[in-house]
């Protein structure tokens, strides 16, 4: 029996101010997938995540998350936005930052956290190996520790799906290596979708890959094909696989 997809998108179109951002997107993400969506800056990757989250509505097409509409399933989705969107100088503890991941579930004008919420936050911090930093100010953490705190914030609600937007941008190589170790551990219990503009993403850490630049170019494996990358990046490439995929860009024709 074929597994029901965790994420199912059919013929999705989205435009902004008359400009088509996403064109005819079809996507199936299955349980346990670690799905990487590559593409250039401005190719629609963040927009696609926002559609999956139910933050914006498509012009046409259907989106189903775990069989329901995105807004009905939002509590089952963890979201890690780009790190630069966070103000790490804000005077808040690591635990308080993680607790903020539960704000969407609170009702009323005054939102308070219970002892049970604190237990959830500490569990998420322990999962990321930074429980000992719970009372530290977020501004005092290293870049890698801040990244772990942001991921813990996405995990505090015990999601079934984890979405990550450019998780390795602006981080150093050791932090990037730590991130992929974390990703491997999380993939044992949830479905993961990660978008990035970095074609050098470590393909050995994902199960499937697609390329997005307004249109989505997919291949039902983690193999990057020449057609996929040419379609997304609009640039001829050779793919050479020796354990880890590598790319060689042919010279661009001279500009007139």
Where are these regions (language model features)?
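Catalytic Walker B motif of ABC-type/P-loop ATPase nucleotide-binding domains
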Residues: 162-166, 171
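Conserved ABC transporter NBD signature motif
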Residues: 61-77
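The feature captures the beta-strand-to-loop junction immediately N-terminal to the Walker
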Residues: 38-40
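Conserved ABC ATPase "signature" region
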Residues: 99, 113-133
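Conserved ABC ATPase signature
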Residues: 137-141, 145
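Helix-to-loop junction immediately C-terminal to a conserved catalytic motif
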Residues: 53
